[in-house]
């Protein structure tokens, strides 16, 4: 592609340290100090200053106790105050997002390059700080420079830290190549270069961490002021592929597993992978059961003719039962139409209560209690199956119709006489996917004694 479209330059660039700067304190004029130490600034230069220097001048220092444990306790309190959410924890390290949207360790609260009786916070508005320094240098030296405020950050998937821009003024922080064509004729579709971060990292080569050199100048780049700021470098958490740490993502998944289960009544035509159903059934079979038994069987209607024959027979019986109740024809057809979901769903599974291993009692009361216990166990397995399907992205709907036609179901499917159908489960990908529902308010449904 043409050099005019490049974000960098083929010409040499210079990275110049700004020596002779004082130890900054609250209220100091940062712009005046830089102008005095670097009267050689030119139009087009990029002035790169550490956020620590800005924080000191802006009074973002917090008195801290000298005792290491108390100092660390205060640091953690400040992290909680500065952070709007915690993305990840590992040992004593917290990765947080602050109110500006910056994601970094400890919300930018830092105890390096400050007195042992202080802790530093990030500038309240790093973009505004960059703009103010740019304006001050224009006022004092008559030059048009760009300004970056930087901080040190870790990087996903890679060891080590590098400086990145947290505040910017006077340059395009991003350069998009979408639609451009390289020298081999390949169209660049998604490439977008974070120019501000590249400059920040380069400038750190002369600033260092131990040299008391908080300001550097990058010279030789052709920068364009498009009005963008460092905020444009931030991707909102919900749009990021890695917006939670591993442990936090697993915890969220566990918390949402139950809430993902919803009654889905309209499915897409997308086929359901058989292995997903098998995996969900395998998990459902771990549900609690009495006497170490297996009180449930899942009958998977995989043969279309078998499913249709069963549903047609159930429909005829349902019509006859409703007619026997004296219902009008329109009411009967409305009720019968509710079962259409079992015709339309990509997959249907029928849970069966199987009394293998049930204890025998001479009296009806204990016999009924034993049956209830097995019924509860099958219900637990059904719920586990529905949740297992949901966490795999599959929708489902439990329908009780087979309970009302137990003999018919056993006959049509050739099942033993003591197997009891406990509904039917329609399975498929939801036509309109939905996220997890909110939990219910227990209210007076949770009774305390």
From Swiss-Prot:
Cofactor: Mg(2+); Mn(2+); K(+)
EC number: 6.3.2.31, 6.3.2.34, 1.3.8.17
Pathway terms, separated by semicolons: Cofactor biosynthesis; coenzyme F420 biosynthesis
Catalysed reactions listed for this entry: oxidized coenzyme F420-0 + GTP + L-glutamate = oxidized coenzyme F420-1 + GDP + phosphate + H(+); oxidized coenzyme F420-1 + GTP + L-glutamate = oxidized coenzyme F420-2 + GDP + phosphate + H(+); oxidized coenzyme F420-(gamma-L-Glu)(n) + GTP + L-glutamate = oxidized coenzyme F420-(gamma-L-Glu)(n+1) + GDP + phosphate + H(+); oxidized coenzyme F420-0 + FMN + H(+) = dehydro coenzyme F420-0 + FMNH2
Binding residues annotated for a divalent metal cation 1, in chain numbering: 110, 151
Pfam family, one: F420_ligase
MF-aspect GO terms: coenzyme F420-0:L-glutamate ligase activity; coenzyme F420-1:gamma-L-glutamate ligase activity; GTP binding; metal ion binding; oxidoreductase activity, acting on the CH-CH group of donors, with a flavin as acceptor
Keywords: GTP-binding, Ligase, Magnesium, Manganese, Metal-binding, Multifunctional enzyme, Nucleotide-binding, Oxidoreductase, Potassium
Binding locations of FMN: 261-265, 289, 400, 437
Cofactor note: Binds 2 divalent metal cations per subunit. The ions could be magnesium and/or manganese. Monovalent cation. The ion could be potassium.
Binding site for coenzyme F420-(gamma-Glu)n: 321
Region (Coenzyme F420:L-glutamate ligase): 1-245
GO biological process, one term: F420-0 metabolic process
Residue numbers binding GTP: 21-24, 51, 56, 113
Highest taxon in the source lineage: Bacteria
Binding-site list for a divalent metal cation 2: 152
SUPFAM superfamilies per record: CofE-like (SSF144010), FMN-dependent nitroreductase-like (SSF55469)
Family per record: In the N-terminal section; belongs to the CofE family.
Function text: Bifunctional enzyme that catalyzes the GTP-dependent successive addition of multiple gamma-linked L-glutamates to the L-lactyl phosphodiester of 7,8-didemethyl-8-hydroxy-5-deazariboflavin (F420-0) to form polyglutamated F420 derivatives, and the FMNH2-dependent reduction of dehydro-F420-0 to form F420-0.
UniProt protein name: Bifunctional F420 biosynthesis protein FbiB
